[in-house]
Amino acid sequence: MTSTTSTVARIALEPRTIDAGGIETSYLEAGAGEPVVMLHGSGPGVSAIANWQNNIGTLAQRFRVLAPDIVGFGATERPDDVTYSLRAWTDHIWAFIDAHGIGKTAIVGNSLGGRIALQMATDCPDRIAKMVLMGAPGVGMTLTEGLAALRAYEPSHDAMRDLLRSYFAVDPAMITDELVAIRYEASIADGAYEAYRAMFLDPRHAGSELGITEDEVRAIATPTLLVHGREDKVVPVQVSVTMLGLLPNADLHVFSACGHWTQIERADEFSALVADYLARR
């Protein structure tokens, strides 16, 4: 039976801040044990809380979970001198991990967060214990209709609702008024829209920068769980199928009747799947 609602009670999550490489970084933290860093995707109004509020409670029962707002997103500082790029985002997450004194960690990355995780595994493979990549861009990624719609967003409550319901979930009922409000308010926070436009002013350039070659992927030996929604309109499931054939230590789980947001559309199953994978020795 397809799960369409989360039965796991949310835990109280109060944002914290830490200096990460000179950037005042907002993040969520819960639990104890081996560290798991959760990286949200891109898009207008994205943040750690909007991305992971249905999952942190389950994972925090077994791990120390940290979920930052990546520079340019959420409540994290937006320095005037930052040029948003894969390198800048990756360096910010390394600084965040270092600021917490963490040597080695697992990474759970959604969409853009998954691409950052791949770069981290390339940079310092000995510091990444495992990866979970959800709807992440990879080899063969092209500019889809969903990505184009994301980058064309102009702030309004109706535009945010229509964007999320049209491209992110198979069942529009999964896009709650609460989620729309969280995303919309974040998209009009001071400097948020300007930062988002700066990231994706030229979608062709942004897309090419996030690309990765087959040889680069084959060189990543980190144990990896690929998770994808079969009906994903933002990053097609075929991207993960291709990555499965290239990553030497990868498994793939595809959720049927599911779009780009596996962690929201199939929250309970996703959280249990990820927790079990990360706990496996």
Question: Where are the language model's segments positioned?
Answer:
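Flexible "cap/lid" loop of the alpha/beta hydrolase fold
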Residues: 118-122, 129-162
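Acidic catalytic loop of the alpha/beta-hydrolase fold
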Residues: 231-235
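Catalytic active-site module of serine/aspartate enzymes centered on a nucleophile-bearing elbow/loop
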Residues: 250-281
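Gly/Ala-rich beta-loop-alpha elbow adjacent to hydrolase catalytic centers
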Residues: 109, 113, 117
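Conserved HGGG/HGGXW glycine-rich cap/lid loop of the alpha/beta-hydrolase fold
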Residues: 23-75
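Active-site loop/oxyanion-hole signature of alpha/beta-hydrolase fold enzymes
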Residues: 28, 57, 67-108, 272
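Short beta-strand/loop motif that positions the catalytic acidic residue
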Residues: 220, 226-228
